[in-house]
């Protein structure tokens, strides 16, 4: 008899606001013919309110993202198809929520509640086979944020982006949940240059072959 092993490839793309995660997700999905899972920013009912009044809406927003990404991971497992995911469940818990808490924009009880819920969910999900981290300088992030022109992002401060960048670097430095590929996007333009995109594809192929 024949034993069939269904091996699903799950690639996730991580990075700060404006790093180019969504663009790269689309490009890689097209190249590999994988399904794509995007971060829910279009239908998110809390984003506008959060950027206008962070302290009031931080917990609501983080719970919404946690719920959304947990559902994505559940769907990835149940669908049984190769997928590229725009941002991971780990970024909320290791970067965004603790940053809001440290800045005094999320209360102790809300943060403990959030963290408890994440820890419970984390026990039931599988980490990505490959995590791609898009590393970027603050000036580059600011340039990209202004270029794409999302109105709710106009109020994002340099300090906020810098704090997130510091937490991203600390998280990536200790990441051991699977294969990791770090791409410095200050030195590469995968949007305008097909050659640069191919360089990324070659690096991915080397990691997952």
Regions found by a protein language model. Name each.
Residues 13:
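Hydrophobic anchor at the beta1->P-loop junction of P-loop NTPases
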Residues 16:
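P-loop (Walker A) phosphate-binding loop of NTP-binding proteins
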Residues 21:
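Conserved lysine of the Walker
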Residues 24-25:
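Post-Walker A alpha-helix
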Residues 30-68:
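Conserved substrate/cofactor phosphate-moiety recognition/catalytic segment
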Residues 57, 61-126:
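Glycine-rich phosphate-binding loop used to anchor ATP phosphates in small-molecule kinases
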Residues 95-167:
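A glycine- and Lys/Arg-enriched "phosphate-lid" helix/loop adjacent to the NTP-binding pocket
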Residues 142-209:
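NTP-dependent small-molecule kinase module
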